[in-house]
């Protein structure tokens, strides 16, 4: 059993999603949004740190998956996003949880089959894959999508790695 925490970073709203992977079965554990209500940016970062740490303490994930940065037109927004993202990564590292990063296009392609999918399509697939009765909030759905992507990609990577190891051993005999 592997518990995966997915994070969709943001300086005002950070989404989180926690899922459990047992074999090929993915189960929903929790999701939500960390809303930073203050205009004081250092206090927003502090709120992200505290709340992500609480989620980690409660669910004890073995894996931390987060969205990679994308090139933004507004440099100030990109800097704030990178700082919020960095704070979340530091929380994971302080808890000795390995960090994996996924591009937004990769997440969309993994869940929907096309890298240019819209938020509604991603939300629908998250709801379908995790058998949810309602759509999660947008940022929480994105975080769950990142966690699901990690499960799918790591499963395929492990399968490929194992196959290569067997072939390599076969050649050595």
Curated annotation (Swiss-Prot):
Cofactor comment text: Binds 2 Mg(2+) ion per subunit.
GO biological process: DNA recombination; DNA repair
Keyword Disulfide bond: no
Names of the cofactor(s): Mg(2+)
Residues bound to Mg(2+) 2: 67
Residues at which Mg(2+) 1 binds: 8, 139
Catalytic residues of the enzyme: 8, 67, 139
Enzyme class: hydrolase
InterPro entries xref list: RNaseH-like_sf, RNaseH_sf, X-over_junc_endoDNase_Mg_BS, X-over_junc_endoDNase_RuvC
A molecular function (GO) term: DNA binding
EC number of the protein: 3.1.21.10
Catalytic activity: Endonucleolytic cleavage at a junction such as a reciprocal single-stranded crossover between two homologous DNA duplexes (Holliday junction)
Compartment annotation: Cytoplasm
Keywords recorded for this protein, A-Z: Cytoplasm, DNA damage, DNA recombination, DNA repair, DNA-binding, Endonuclease, Hydrolase, Magnesium, Metal-binding, Nuclease
Gene Ontology CC terms, in alphabetical order: cytoplasm; Holliday junction resolvase complex
SUPFAM superfamilies for the chain: Ribonuclease H-like
Function: The RuvA-RuvB-RuvC complex processes Holliday junction (HJ) DNA during genetic recombination and DNA repair. Endonuclease that resolves HJ intermediates. Cleaves cruciform DNA by making single-stranded nicks across the HJ at symmetrical positions within the homologous arms, yielding a 5'-phosphate and a 3'-hydroxyl group; requires a central core of homology in the junction. The consensus cleavage sequence is 5'-(A/T)TT(C/G)-3'. Cleavage occurs on the 3'-side of the TT dinucleotide at the point of strand exchange.
PANTHER family associated with the record: CROSSOVER JUNCTION ENDODEOXYRIBONUCLEASE RUVC
Subunit structure: Homodimer which binds Holliday junction (HJ) DNA. The HJ becomes 2-fold symmetrical on binding to RuvC with unstacked arms; it has a different conformation from HJ DNA in complex with RuvA. In the full resolvosome a probable DNA-RuvA(4)-RuvB(12)-RuvC(2) complex forms which resolves the HJ.
Similarity comment text for this entry: Belongs to the RuvC family.
Name of the protein described by the UniProt record: Crossover junction endodeoxyribonuclease RuvC
Gene that this sequence comes from: ruvC
């Amino acid at each position: 059993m592997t518990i995966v925490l997915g994070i969709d970073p943001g300086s005002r709203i950070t989404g989180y999603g926690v899922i459990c992977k047992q074999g090929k079965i993915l189960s929903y554990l929790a999701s939500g949004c960390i809303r930073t209500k203050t205009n004081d940016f250092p206090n927003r970062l502090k709120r992200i740190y505290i709340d992500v740490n609480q989620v980690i303490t409660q669910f004890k994930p073995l894996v931390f998956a987060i969205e990679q940065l994308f090139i933004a037109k507004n440099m100030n927004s990109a800097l704030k996003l990178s700082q919020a993202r960095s704070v979340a990564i530091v929380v994971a590292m302080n808890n000795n949880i390995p960090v994996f990063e996924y591009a937004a296009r990769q997440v969309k392609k993994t869940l929907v089959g096309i890298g240019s999918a819209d938020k509604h399509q991603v939300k629908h697939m998250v709801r379908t894959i995790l058998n949810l009765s309602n759509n999660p909030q947008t940022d929480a759905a994105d975080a769950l999508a990142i966690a699901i992507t990690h499960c799918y990609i790591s499963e395929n990577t492990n399968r490929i790695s194992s196959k290569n190891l067997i072939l390599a051993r076969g050649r050595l005999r």
